[in-house]
Amino acid sequence: KLLTDILAGVLEMHSKSAPKYGSEKSGAPTNFYITLSPDPIKITNAELEDVEVVISPDHRSFIHTNPLRGLAAGGTFILQSSATPEEVWAELPPQARKTIREKKINFLVIDAFAVAKKHAPTPELATRMMGIAFIGAVAGHVQQVSAGASAKAILEKMRKQIAKKFGSKGAAVVEGNMEVIREGIEATHKVDYTAAAFTKIDAKPAAIALRNVSLSASMCQTSGSSGCGGMFDREYF
């Protein structure tokens, strides 16, 4: 929701957003759809089938779903990972690599977890901070958003929206969020799968992954005061 509000303000567009939850209560995969348009958006709560940008905060998402499904040719895929671009590419299923190459997808990785952990004053705010790091990744590296604008111009627009959202909480809160956005931009790396190193990875036998949704569910605690405190488990990310 925060990403929707910030991007709509930066781009000066109309917006709609809607979550889609699984039937399970804890640890279930969740999709969140965002639509931005210069014209009023008539549809509501729509499950989008064709999209231009996909953000996956779960680096194991390929184990239990296909985050590339519906991503348009030339679109952008942003994946949470603490690994190097080469390591990330090596862990992808062969079919995912094939899809990314054929559709010429702009593939980016960011360790939003590390950025969030560094700045979050409490575990309860860590999830929000992780989302703000992704805002930096989108604003700084997605062509539909940056539209060739300079980093300075983008950050100035972002600051206005952050001040609008959090200004009542004080200048320190605004600056703290801006620092996360700046680091989110800097922590985002392009996966240059056209390079020779990635071609060599493709030639190696693919690793066999165990398809078990519990791998993603394991990042949420089943007890305790914070239902998603386990999300910030370095062993998971």
Label each region the model flagged:
Residues 1-233:
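Active-site cofactor/cluster-binding pocket
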